[in-house]
Regions:
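Start-of-helix register in tetratricopeptide repeats
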Residues: 8-12, 46-47, 77-80, 112-114, ...
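"A position-specific structural signal for the A-helix of alpha-solenoid helical repeats
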Residues: 12, 16, 51, 81-84, ...
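Alpha-helical adaptor scaffolds
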Residues: 19-22, 35, 49-54, 116-120, ...
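Structural motif corresponding to the intra-repeat A-B loop/turn of tetratricopeptide repeats
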Residues: 24-25, 59-60, 89, 124, ...
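TPR-repeat structural position
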Residues: 27-28, 62, 92-93, 126-127, ...
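Single-residue signature of alpha-solenoid repeat helices
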Residues: 30, 65, 95, 129-130, ...
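Alpha-solenoid helical repeat scaffolds
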Residues: 35, 67-70, 100, 131-135, ...
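TPR/TPR-like (Sel1-like) alpha-helical repeat modules
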Residues: 70-77, 87-108, 162-175, 230, ...
Length: 270
């Protein structure tokens, strides 16, 4: 049918005109051409919406791109456009809300990790939001070393993360996780002490474990045991945190010269 072919051709020409108008900064013209293209050939409705999103991204207007894409069912290409728009929008809440739909179409783990870290930092101290956010993540993100570590750091009530950290350490020994395990709450303090003391059998030479134990003993009001653990941690080449903790303990005990040495080391290692 020649009239149908003419409509096809005219519709495509109008889409091309919309692209040209966008490139020239003629926003009113762009919208007019997009509307006329669909009026001329209704089968171009989806193509016009996708083009509208592409053009919005080109002019760095992620909100317009997301509005357009939210009106259609996503396929792989449209989902990639939505991902670009979300990255450009810098709105972690909108990104989190979009993740379940995007996961169905391609691997979102890298993006999910990025967004999770932003959200977990933004909600630091707001445990209800942190727990909900962490629970909503896919398994890959929840098992990410960076994501789990940030979740633990952001929590004000550390008991929420104790089983997760202990399970992660049991699965694969990780000195950073072990150090975090020492950042305790009173409710899980005994359980943490028992677990950490049990790890000594296999990991007696890990400075992070002695740092962890030092923190736990300090919270348990066992300053002598804390001092021994922090001392062992720094002897094994532990991090600046061990020197800082030991320095503060020594100062509290009136041993200011030794304290100053460790605090100076903590600063020099930073």
């Amino acid at each position: 049918d020649r009239s149908g072919e003419n409509n096809d051709s005219k519709g495509m020409n109008l889409l091309s005109a919309a692209r040209a108008a966008n490139n020239q900064g003629d926003h009113e013209g762009r919208e007019t051409y997009l509307r006329k293209a669909v009026e001329t050939d209704p089968s171009l409705s989806r193509a016009a919406i996708v083009l509208s999103a592409e053009l919005a991204l080109r002019r760095r207007d992620p909100a317009a791109a997301l509005t357009a894409l939210d009106s259609i069912k996503l396929n792989g290409y449209a989902a990639e456009l939505k991902l670009q728009a979300l990255k450009m929008s810098d709105d972690w809440r909108a990104s989190m809300a979009a993740l379940p739909g995007l996961r169905k179409l391609f691997d979102t783990e890298s993006f999910e990790n990025e967004i999770a870290l932003i959200g977990l930092r933004a909600e630091a101290g707001n445990d209800a939001e942190l727990n909900a956010l962490f629970k909503s993540l896919g398994a890959g993100a929840r098992n990410s070393r960076e994501v789990l570590s940030q979740y633990v750091k952001s929590l004000s009530y550390k008991a929420h993360a104790e089983p997760l950290l202990r399970a992660a350490i049991k699965k694969s020994w990780d000195s950073d996780y072990v150090s975090l395990y020492g950042d305790a709450d009173f409710d899980t303090l005994k359980a943490r002490c028992k677990a950490a003391e049990g790890w000594l059998k296999l990991h007696e030479e890990d400075p992070a474990l002695h740092y962890c134990l030092g923190c736990l003993y300090e919270l348990s009001n066992e300053p002598n045991m804390a001092r021994e653990s922090f001392t062992r941690s720094v002897e094994l080449g532990g991090s600046l945190k061990g020197h800082e903790k030991l320095g503060l303990l020594l100062a509290h005990n009136g041993e200011f010269e030794s304290s100053a040495q460790h605090l100076k080391l903590a600063l020099s290692l930073d």
